[in-house]
């Protein structure tokens, strides 16, 4: 209801100042607000933004500490960890510098591109970084994105997910991390510009350019297409860190061709560099290789930090199964423990599981599905039987026998066996 001083002169609904006492009085639905109250609200919002940033920047660990924490969760990829740790540290120090009002040198944002085979730890690295820094984090799949106006997700929906992760705290969301997976799938279909519209390839790259570089985006809080009449949330993406990841299948051939190691011509050795795996080839990656693959130069320019991840070998996969804080085997052991049961996996069985994952070319991601398949029947039974010890041998992994189940109650010594046997050197 409009508040009036003498039924003639309007007053501010917040500070009660009369119209002639302020420079401007802005009308809203049944309320008025003066320019002084607007300035006050703006100052409060700026102060909240500073507090949110201070909470983040005051607790930024050094690159060495970030690497040490990453080592607890991610196996191998030492060079990638080092590059990520330095990049993330510098990013949040840059925010502190910008917020201080010091404009001597303009520091640009450095987004990151991770290139590595499926299951090499790209997503896990990004997730772990967000946990270390305690900032809002969201993941998006590039394959579901299309240009605005076409069937599929708009790029603004990525920002909406970040807002949801930040519980719609705009100041906090503006300092978050966005991980875009499968970014290699939005490569344009051919190296040369096409006369037909590529709405899920080059079109998506074009749509991502602005938000990755930094812009004030209009984000639909209820999703963009089903509620066209809604009010939009304004989100500044200038300080959001974008990490893109992809397997980039086939880029090794582009690199090999460029470095004159392709098997072409009479003098070429067809088996040349067979011992040289994809990880070693990727270390020779250049910007022109990404362009030839299908990323447009403007998109590559928004990702100045590029790092490659190594292909995981058998030893690395075995380590992933058992060593990290959230190791897959430890998780299944805890599941069995909740049913008063034990899970024992022999060393030879661990090797067989790793070999299966290598054969499927699924990397670390395939380990869980292999274990889930092996333990399904056992988990189905132990919930009823209780006090059971389930032993997984190499023969069980290879499908020759069923998992061995023995009663813990009937065991004479009832001595607890090692949950994971030591792997012989």
From Swiss-Prot:
<dbReference type="GO" id="GO:0051082">
    <property type="term" value="F:unfolded protein binding"/>
</dbReference>
<dbReference type="Pfam" id="PF10431">
    <property type="entry name" value="ClpB_D2-small"/>
</dbReference>
<dbReference type="GO" id="GO:0051603">
    <property type="term" value="P:proteolysis involved in protein catabolic process"/>
</dbReference>
<dbReference type="GO" id="GO:0009376">
    <property type="term" value="C:HslUV protease complex"/>
</dbReference>
<keyword id="KW-0143">Chaperone</keyword>
<dbReference type="InterPro" id="IPR003593">
    <property type="entry name" value="AAA+_ATPase"/>
</dbReference>
<feature type="binding site">
    <location>
        <position position="34"/>
    </location>
    <ligand>
        <name>Zn(2+)</name>
    </ligand>
</feature>
<dbReference type="InterPro" id="IPR027417">
    <property type="entry name" value="P-loop_NTPase"/>
</dbReference>
<keyword id="KW-0067">ATP-binding</keyword>
<comment type="subunit">
    <text>Component of the ClpX-ClpP complex. Forms a hexameric ring that, in the presence of ATP, binds to fourteen ClpP subunits assembled into a disk-like structure with a central cavity, resembling the structure of eukaryotic proteasomes.</text>
</comment>
<feature type="binding site">
    <location>
        <position position="15"/>
    </location>
    <ligand>
        <name>Zn(2+)</name>
    </ligand>
</feature>
<dbReference type="InterPro" id="IPR019489">
    <property type="entry name" value="Clp_ATPase_C"/>
</dbReference>
<dbReference type="InterPro" id="IPR050052">
    <property type="entry name" value="ATP-dep_Clp_protease_ClpX"/>
</dbReference>
<dbReference type="InterPro" id="IPR003959">
    <property type="entry name" value="ATPase_AAA_core"/>
</dbReference>
<dbReference type="Pfam" id="PF06689">
    <property type="entry name" value="zf-C4_ClpX"/>
</dbReference>
<dbReference type="GO" id="GO:0140662">
    <property type="term" value="F:ATP-dependent protein folding chaperone"/>
</dbReference>
<comment type="similarity">
    <text>Belongs to the ClpX chaperone family.</text>
</comment>
<dbReference type="GO" id="GO:0016887">
    <property type="term" value="F:ATP hydrolysis activity"/>
</dbReference>
<dbReference type="InterPro" id="IPR038366">
    <property type="entry name" value="Znf_CppX_C4_sf"/>
</dbReference>
<feature type="binding site">
    <location>
        <position position="37"/>
    </location>
    <ligand>
        <name>Zn(2+)</name>
    </ligand>
</feature>
<feature type="binding site">
    <location>
        <begin position="117"/>
        <end position="124"/>
    </location>
    <ligand>
        <name>ATP</name>
    </ligand>
</feature>
<dbReference type="GO" id="GO:0008270">
    <property type="term" value="F:zinc ion binding"/>
</dbReference>
<dbReference type="GO" id="GO:0005524">
    <property type="term" value="F:ATP binding"/>
</dbReference>
<keyword id="KW-0479">Metal-binding</keyword>
<dbReference type="Pfam" id="PF07724">
    <property type="entry name" value="AAA_2"/>
</dbReference>
<dbReference type="GO" id="GO:0046983">
    <property type="term" value="F:protein dimerization activity"/>
</dbReference>
<keyword id="KW-0547">Nucleotide-binding</keyword>
<feature type="domain" description="ClpX-type ZB">
    <location>
        <begin position="1"/>
        <end position="53"/>
    </location>
</feature>
<dbReference type="InterPro" id="IPR046425">
    <property type="entry name" value="ClpX_bact"/>
</dbReference>
<feature type="binding site">
    <location>
        <position position="12"/>
    </location>
    <ligand>
        <name>Zn(2+)</name>
    </ligand>
</feature>
<dbReference type="GO" id="GO:0051301">
    <property type="term" value="P:cell division"/>
</dbReference>
<keyword id="KW-0862">Zinc</keyword>
<dbReference type="InterPro" id="IPR010603">
    <property type="entry name" value="Znf_CppX_C4"/>
</dbReference>
<protein>
    <recommendedName>
        <fullName>ATP-dependent Clp protease ATP-binding subunit ClpX</fullName>
    </recommendedName>
</protein>
<dbReference type="InterPro" id="IPR004487">
    <property type="entry name" value="Clp_protease_ATP-bd_su_ClpX"/>
</dbReference>
<comment type="function">
    <text>ATP-dependent specificity component of the Clp protease. It directs the protease to specific substrates. Can perform chaperone functions in the absence of ClpP.</text>
</comment>
């Amino acid at each position: 209801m409009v508040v009036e001083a003498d039924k003639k002169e309007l007053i501010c609904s917040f500070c009660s100042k009369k119209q002639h006492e302020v420079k401007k009085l802005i009308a809203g639905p049944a309320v008025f607000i003066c320019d002084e109250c607007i300035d006050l609200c703006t100052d409060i919002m700026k102060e909240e933004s500073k507090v949110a940033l201070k909470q983040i920047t005051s607790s930024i660990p050094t690159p060495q500490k970030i690497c040490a924490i990453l080592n607890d969760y991610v196996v191998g990829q030492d060079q990638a960890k080092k590059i990520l740790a330095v990049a993330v540290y510098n990013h949040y120090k840059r925010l502190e510098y910008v917020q201080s009002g010091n404009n001597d040198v303009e520091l640009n944002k450095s987004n990151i591109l991770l290139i590595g085979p499926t299951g090499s730890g790209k997503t896990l690295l990004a997730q772990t970084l967000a946990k270390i820094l305690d900032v809002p984090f969201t993941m998006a799949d590039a394959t579901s994105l299309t240009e605005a106006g076409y069937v599929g997700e708009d790029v603004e929906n990525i920002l909406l997910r970040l807002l949801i992760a930040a519980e719609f705290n705009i100041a906090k969301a503006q300092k978050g991390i966005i991980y875009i997976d499968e970014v290699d799938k939005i490569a344009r279909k051919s190296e040369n510009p096409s006369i037909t519209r590529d709405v899920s390839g080059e079109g998506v790259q074009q749509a991502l350019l602005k938000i990755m570089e930094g812009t004030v985006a209009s984000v639909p809080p209820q999703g963009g297409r089903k509620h066209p009449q809604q009010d939009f949330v304004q989100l500044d993406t200038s300080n959001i860190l974008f990490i893109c990841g992809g397997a980039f299948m086939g880029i090794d051939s582009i690199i090999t061709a460029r470095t004159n190691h392709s098997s072409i011509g009479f003098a070429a050795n067809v088996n040349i560099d067979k011992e040289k795996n994809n990880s070693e080839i990727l270390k020779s990656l250049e910007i022109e290789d990404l362009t030839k693959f299908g990323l447009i130069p403007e998109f590559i320019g928004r990702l100045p930090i590029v790092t490659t991840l190594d292909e995981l070998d058998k030893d690395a996969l075995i380590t992933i199964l058992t060593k990290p804080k959230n190791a897959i085997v430890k998780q299944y052991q805890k599941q069995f423990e909740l049913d008063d049961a034990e899970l024992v996996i022999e060393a030879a069985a661990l090797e067989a599981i790793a070999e299966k994952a290598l054969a499927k070319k699924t990397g670390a991601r395939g380990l869980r599905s292999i274990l889930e398949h092996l333990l399904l029947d056992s988990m189905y039974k132990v919930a009823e039987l209780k006090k059971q010890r389930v032993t997984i041998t190499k023969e069980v992994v290879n499908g020759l026998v069923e998992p061995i189940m023995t009663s813990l109650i009937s065991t004479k010594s009832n001595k607890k066996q090692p949950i994971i046997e030591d792997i012989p050197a």
